[in-house]
């Protein structure tokens, strides 16, 4: 049995495919039970957000588990497995642990450091438990991951990494629009301090200079994920008069619009909304351009010469770089933000969390290896106790004249000899279990003492035909 994660995210798949592969809350229990019924899957948890759909599982075999989970993702998305496979990534055992720990800390998010993912992982785990599909193997993994996530968000300033990008982007955009009056800034909280709210989950606001306000500005946000929600929050606090949320999925646009007192529209409304907007912030994660040169050029004649600023927070770009050549149009992209942002501090925070994740992964794997040896030690002692019991019974029948005191001494001596013989190897195998390759010592004990094969065996990662992709 081993840990496995198979999934797709904003780095490996376009938004349209992510939407097809997403699993709603109502559908999750059925998906979980379908996974549990698969031949090679013992336990499962489904994590489905705007930017990822991942299935974490404890599986009997690597290849069988990958096949079962990939088939399930194909059924969910309605996409032929041959077409879907190129967008999937697979992580096994240690890399699966490291991936989950990175995800829950926000390192793998489109908005680095966002803490909304912590609540989403917790919810996915609880759903798996409620469905009876997340057992002891995944419970230990997810409980450890949630502890790591809490540490990352309370002991470092990783929350500020992504929030800083949004805040600085809006400050630069407001400066380009020529709006310079002062309004209250987004509250700042230190690590472990009081946080604001993003999508029902705590998120620390950016500890950066107050962004110039957007008093009187109309702001159009394209994309309703974590980045779009944070941008809406920041723009609203900066004084934006009107906030419009455009998204491929109307329900998501409506949800974010309701959170930030905005208005939801579809992507087909972009020509009119660009005509009316002062600032357009885009963060869809689409693989192609969302706003091209011709769309913007067509809107300019009706704007009366008002400046128009685009803030492109997506990678790859949502906004056609060619719009920079249009009169009165400015474009701020991630490269420009990296120059304006204190990149050294952001890099320091990210590296601090990566170091934390690395340490926690090593500790988790050590504990798991040691835990896997425990059943073997228990089986060995049970085997020894059975042998002692049988031999004492045989001895008792041959020495019926021994009184209770004499028999107690004989039994005690036999048990002490057996305990002393077993003490050194059982203690040593537990010590060695935490080291790489330590599983082999438990296997040796099972072979030498012919212990029952139902004792969980440790299967180390083989040379895999399927390359693990990030």
UniProtKB/Swiss-Prot annotation:
Return the EC number: 1.2.1.70
Q: Which enzyme class?
A: oxidoreductase
Q: Which residues bind substrate?
A: 49-52, 109, 114-116, 120
Q: Which UniProt keywords apply?
A: NADP, Oxidoreductase, Porphyrin biosynthesis
Oxidoreductase among keywords: yes
Metabolic or biological pathway, per its Swiss-Prot or TrEMBL entry:
Porphyrin-containing compound metabolism; protoporphyrin-IX biosynthesis; 5-aminolevulinate from L-glutamyl-tRNA(Glu): step 1/2
- Gene3D superfamilies linked: Glutamyl-tRNA reductase, N-terminal domain, NAD(P)-binding Rossmann-like Domain
Per the record, a Pfam family? Shikimate_DH
Residues annotated as site: Important for activity? 99
Subunit structure, per the record? Homodimer.
Q: What is known of its domains?
A: Possesses an unusual extended V-shaped dimeric structure with each monomer consisting of three distinct domains arranged along a curved 'spinal' alpha-helix. The N-terminal catalytic domain specifically recognizes the glutamate moiety of the substrate. The second domain is the NADPH-binding domain, and the third C-terminal domain is responsible for dimerization.
**HAMAP family linked to this entry:** Glu_tRNA_reductase
Q: What is this protein called?
A: Glutamyl-tRNA reductase
């Amino acid at each position: 049995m081993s840990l496995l994660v198979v999934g797709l995210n904003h780095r490996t798949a376009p938004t349209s495919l992510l939407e097809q592969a997403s699993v709603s809350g109502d559908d999750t229990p059925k998906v979980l039970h379908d996974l549990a019924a698969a031949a090679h899957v013992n336990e499962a948890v489904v994590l489905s957000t705007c930017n990822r759909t991942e299935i974490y599982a404890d599986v009997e075999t690597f290849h069988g588990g990958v096949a079962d989970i990939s088939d399930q993702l194909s059924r969910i998305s309605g996409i032929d497995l041959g077409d879907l496979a190129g967008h999937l990534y697979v992580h096994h055992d240690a890399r699966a642990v490291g991936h989950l720990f990175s995800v829950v800390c926000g390192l793998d998010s489109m908005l680095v450091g966002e803490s909304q993912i912590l609540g989403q992982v917790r919810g996915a785990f609880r759903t798996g438990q409620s469905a009876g599909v997340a057992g002891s193997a995944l419970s230990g993994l997810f409980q450890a991951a949630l502890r790591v996530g809490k540490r990352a968000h309370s002991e470092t300033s990783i929350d500020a990494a992504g929030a800083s990008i949004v805040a600085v982007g809006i400050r630069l955009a407001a400066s380009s629009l020529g709006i310079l009056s002062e309004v209250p800034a987004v509250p700042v909280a230190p690590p472990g301090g009081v946080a604001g709210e993003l999508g029902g989950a705590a998120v620390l606001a950016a500890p950066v200079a107050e962004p110039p306000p957007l008093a009187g500005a109309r702001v159009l946000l394209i994309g309703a994920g974590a980045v779009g929600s944070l941008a809406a929050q920041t723009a609203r606090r900066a004084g934006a008069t009107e906030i419009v949320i455009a998204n491929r999925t109307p329900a998501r646009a409506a949800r974010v619009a309701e959170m930030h007192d905005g208005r939801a529209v579809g992507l087909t409304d972009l020509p009119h909304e660009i005509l009316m907007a002062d600032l357009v912030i885009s963060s869809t994660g689409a693989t192609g351009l969302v706003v091209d040169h011709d769309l913007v050029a067509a809107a300019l004649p009706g704007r009366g010469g008002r400046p128009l600023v685009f803030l492109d927070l997506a990678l790859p770009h949502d906004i056609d770089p060619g719009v920079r050549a249009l009169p009165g149009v400015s474009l701020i992209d991630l490269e420009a933000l990296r120059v304006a942002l204190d990149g050294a501090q952001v890099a320091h925070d990210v590296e601090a969390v990566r170091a934390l994740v690395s340490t926690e992964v090593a500790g988790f794997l050590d504990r798991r290896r040691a835990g896997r040896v425990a059943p073997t030690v228990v089986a060995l002692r049970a085997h020894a106790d059975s042998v002692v019991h049988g031999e004492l019974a045989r001895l008792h029948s041959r020495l019926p004249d021994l009184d209770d005191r004499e028999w107690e001494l004989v039994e005690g001596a036999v048990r002490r000899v057996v305990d002393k013989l077993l003490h050194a190897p059982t203690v040593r195998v537990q010590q060695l279990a935490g080291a790489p390759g330590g599983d082999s010592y438990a296997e040796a004990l099972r072979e030498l003492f012919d212990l029952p094969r139902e004792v969980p065996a440790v299967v180390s990662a083989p040379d895999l035909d399927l390359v693990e992709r990030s």
